[in-house]
Amino acid sequence: MSLNIGLDLCDDYISGYLHEDKLLLSAPAVVCREKKDDLWYIGEEAYRLALSGKGVLTDKLLSLLKKGGTSTVMRKAYTAKQLISRLIAAMLWQLTNGASADSIDRLVIALRSAEKSE
């Protein structure tokens, strides 16, 4: 199986398109780590977990990356690159229903500037 995937990432959302299935998914560009276990969530699930008090949410990931910043979650510092990697991996998993990374033939990622336009 050969998959072609496009991702669009900005501070507010991540969208993914799987060409073969004409599948488009979009989610808020946030990650949340569950307090009890080392489980991570993205998008609306992440917001629900954080609002219930059961998770720690991080947002504005591209801005964090641009500043070279880190986010401390459950007493552990994560780089913006690590958090964005979690976000992208989770979106790819959702798009491909957990298919192996070897099945991805092409992956194109468009990043929107973290700066606000005037």
Regions inferred by a protein language model and the residue ranges of each:
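Short glycine-aspartate micro-motif
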Residues: 2-9, 108
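Conserved phosphate-binding loops in N-terminal lobes of ATP-dependent enzymes
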Residues: 13-110, 115-117
